[in-house]
């Protein structure tokens, strides 16, 4: 049986198979697995999708075949484990294979305690690290707490480790004078910052960081800087600067000041010279590839007893005088990009790989977009972050947890410069289901044809365009709380916050998607949206509201069952017509209907509806490779709709509840002027037809 047949055997379509053939690494992985002779199951396919280079595919495939790997989460854990012996793999599987009933009982216990979905998911991950997520999804189906959402956001900064953070003045410094000077400058205020790179768009994960930085400072009457980490002019633009400022303000945050790392570039050049004079920095002429190779070699040699620092760089012992000369040459542009870098001469006792002589500055011979100046020598992220935190007297430097290993070089550098040291505090990234948030991954999807503000993305601009209120986004990220452990939050929890906000602010209007012409025998004057409407002998209802089969479970119009028309009367079927149906219009006193449906007096107001579904099919798209899980075709359907007159006076971003269809937001693709009007609405959240 060839590979195509194997893939069809796990229910992949021919279209999907042809798409996979464009991914040579994936095909190679699948061929390796097929050649083992093992059954090619969906889990074997998942292994092929997520396996990195040098992964022990054959061993892991055998473990799946032998029944040691029972779910995709455990498989992902094995892959992260790296190359191990079979016995080590088996021990890992046994350690993280759990009794399904124990997991179910654990979930049900938390449900009895009225815990939120997010809390249950987080606690489940802590207790059963590599549990089968399908168990969670099944147990949490239709689990909705009837608890005010304010309960989840009220005390979010008073829970967990964050309530034990230091007060200004309590964080230790190299000297007492450094702290005294800091307190004189700040008056003991809490000072935080939000430091995005202007090389992409903010997403919902950034909303969590924004809320933490701004709300923590606000709680203590402090201030927050919006500081751009603009150390790489190759990837930055004024458009991205302005877009980030717009997003921050749209979410409701007003920074004390907008600053940038580039405000301090000249100061950092002088600091670099200070470090050279202290013999704590040197100019290195190794390429970046050679630097990486030498670091790897040094770690290996050190483990074997040879800790010669010159393995890291043959230029490490260059004299101070010569380093000053070489650095001046860098500043004057006498070296090309990549020919020379400034490296920190760090203590090598630490096992932290980020203490292996980090690059402090490099040559990028181009004009900085924001400053409109060519600095030639640009500081690295590691250099700029700690220096700018110190210069802005940041008291609480919040970072996502992957920055944990950066703490050591952060404090080493500030101590060598005799500068004030802020405290770094790490929190977990926000991960939500059915999407990806990584800038690298989103960029790859953008390359497939989507825009950064596509409503299927959970970028701030994408969510705004889709119609998510800023208040709902903020309340959601606050409800998740601040933790160190990572978990995936069900996107339905976010949607529940969005729904609650929209119920309060969205204007109700009538919309019909599949119009059915209805001839009525008796005309009257009705009321629609509180405005009198002349009803002629023709109206329109939605085809989905009429069932010709007289199904007893159908609660709207049938040939034997009347239905109410909102603010008009009761419709009773008489007979079919060539282009519709004929009905009698009765009063509610004459006939009590089971249900009321929307209707229109005409089809004069045609609009475009963009019906969005999740961009990814799986709860965790990364489990099978996010590009294999993406659904570009079925995640957007564009259809026509017909609306009542109240919708005509809409503005961009106005939010509507189209009765019994869903919540919609007026898109900026709409044309609204005196000469032309074309309205486009994005589906924010659908409603059940019987809502």
UniProtKB/Swiss-Prot annotation:
Enzyme category, top tier: ligase
Keywords: Aminoacyl-tRNA synthetase, ATP-binding, Ligase, Nucleotide-binding, Protein biosynthesis
Motif ('HIGH' region): 196-206
Keyword Protein biosynthesis found: yes
UniProt: L-glutamine binding residues: 229, 381
Reactions performed catalytically: tRNA(Gln) + L-glutamine + ATP = L-glutaminyl-tRNA(Gln) + AMP + diphosphate
GO molecular function per UniProt: ATP binding; glutamine-tRNA ligase activity; sequence-specific mRNA binding
Binding site for ATP: 197-199, 203-209, 429-430, 437-439
BP terms from Gene Ontology: glutaminyl-tRNA aminoacylation
Alphabetized Pfam families for the sequence: tRNA-synt_1c, tRNA-synt_1c_C2
Record GO cellular component, one term: cytosol
Disulfide bonds: none
The keyword Nucleotide-binding belongs to this UniProt entry's keyword annotation: yes
Enzyme Commission code(s) on record: 6.1.1.18
Motif ('KMSKS' region) on chain: 436-440
Family recorded in the similarity comment: Belongs to the class-I aminoacyl-tRNA synthetase family.
Protein name: Probable glutamine--tRNA ligase
Organism of provenance: Enterocytozoon bieneusi (strain H348)
Lineage: Eukaryota, Fungi, Fungi incertae sedis, Microsporidia, Enterocytozoonidae
């Amino acid at each position: 049986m060839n590979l195509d047949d194997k893939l069809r055997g796990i229910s992949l379509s021919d279209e999907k198979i042809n798409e996979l053939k464009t991914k040579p690494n994936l095909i190679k992985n699948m061929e390796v697995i097929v050649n083992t002779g093992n059954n090619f199951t969906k889990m074997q396919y998942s292994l092929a999708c997520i396996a990195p280079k040098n992964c022990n595919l054959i061993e892991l495939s055998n473990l799946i075949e032998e029944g040691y790997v029972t779910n995709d989460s455990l498989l992902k854990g094995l892959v992260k484990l790296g190359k191990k012996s079979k016995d080590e793999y088996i021990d890992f599987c046994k350690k993280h294979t759990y009794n399904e009933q124990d997991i179910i009982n654990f979930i049900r216990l938390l449900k009895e305690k009225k815990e939120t979905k997010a809390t249950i998911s987080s606690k489940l991950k802590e207790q059963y690290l590599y549990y089968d997520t399908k168990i969670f999804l099944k147990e949490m189906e239709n689990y909705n707490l009837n608890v005010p959402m304010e309960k989840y956001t009220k005390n979010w900064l008073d829970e967990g480790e964050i309530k034990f953070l230091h007060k200004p003045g309590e964080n230790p410094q190299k000297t007492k004078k450094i702290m005294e000077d800091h307190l004189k400058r700040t008056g003991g205020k809490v000072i935080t910052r939000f430091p995005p790179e202007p090389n992409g768009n903010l997403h919902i994960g950034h909303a969590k960081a924004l809320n933490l930085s701004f709300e923590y400072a606000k709680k203590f009457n402090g201030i927050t800087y919006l500081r751009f980490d603009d150390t790489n002019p190759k990837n930055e633009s004024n458009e991205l600067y302005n877009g980030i400022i717009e997003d921050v303000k749209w979410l409701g945050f007003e920074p004390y000041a907008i600053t940038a790392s580039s405000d301090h570039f000249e100061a950092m050049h002088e600091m670099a010279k200070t470090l050279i004079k202290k013999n704590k920095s040197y100019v290195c002429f190794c390429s970046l590839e050679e630097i990486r190779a030498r670091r790897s070699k040094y770690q290996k040699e050190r483990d074997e007893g040879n800790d010669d620092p010159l393995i890291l760089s043959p230029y490490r012992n260059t004299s101070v005088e010569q380093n000053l000369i070489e650095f001046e040459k860098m500043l004057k542009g006498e070296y090309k990009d990549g020919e020379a870098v400034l490296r920190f001469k760090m203590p090598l006792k630490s096992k932290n790989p980020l203490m292996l002589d980090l690059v402090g500055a490099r040559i990028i011979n181009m004009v900085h977009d924001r400053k409109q100046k060519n600095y030639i020598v640009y500081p690295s992220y590691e250099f700029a972050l700690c220096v700018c935190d110190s210069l802005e007297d940041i008291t609480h430097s919040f970072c996502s947890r992957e920055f944990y290993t950066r703490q050591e070089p952060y404090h080493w550098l500030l101590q060598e410069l005799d500068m004030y040291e802020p405290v770094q505090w790490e929190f977990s990234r926000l991960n939500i289901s059915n999407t990806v948030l990584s800038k690298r991954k989103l960029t790859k999807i953008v390359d497939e044809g989507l825009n950064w503000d596509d409503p299927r993305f959970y970028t701030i601009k994408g969510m705004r365009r889709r119609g998510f209120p800023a208040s709902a986004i903020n309340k959601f990220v606050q409800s998740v709380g601040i933790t160190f452990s990572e978990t995936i939050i069900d996107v339905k929890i976010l949607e529940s916050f969005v729904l609650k906000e929209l119920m309060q602010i969205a204007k109700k209007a009538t919309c019909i998607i599949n119009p059915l012409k209805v001839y009525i025998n008796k005309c009257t004057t009705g009321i629609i949206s509180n405005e009198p409407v002349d009803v002629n002998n023709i109206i329109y209802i939605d085809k989905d509201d009429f069932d010709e089969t007289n199904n007893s479970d159908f609660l709207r119009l049938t040939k034997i069952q009347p239905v109410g028309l909102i603010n008009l009367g009761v419709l009773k079927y008489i007979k079919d017509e060539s282009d519709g149906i004929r009905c009698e219009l009765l009063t509610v006193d004459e006939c009590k209907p089971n249900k009321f449906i929307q209707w229109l007096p005409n089809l004069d107001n045609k609009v475009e509806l963009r019906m969005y579904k999740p961009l990814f099919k799986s709860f965790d798209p990364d489990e099978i490779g996010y590009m294999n899980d993406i659904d570009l075709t079925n995640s957007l359907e564009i259809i026509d709709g017909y609306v009542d007159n109240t919708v005509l006076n809409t503005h961009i971003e106005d939010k509507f509840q189209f009765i019994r269809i869903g919540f919609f937001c007026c898109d900026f693709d709409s044309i609204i002027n005196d000469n032309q009007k074309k309205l486009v609405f994005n589906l924010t959240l659908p409603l059940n037809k019987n809502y």
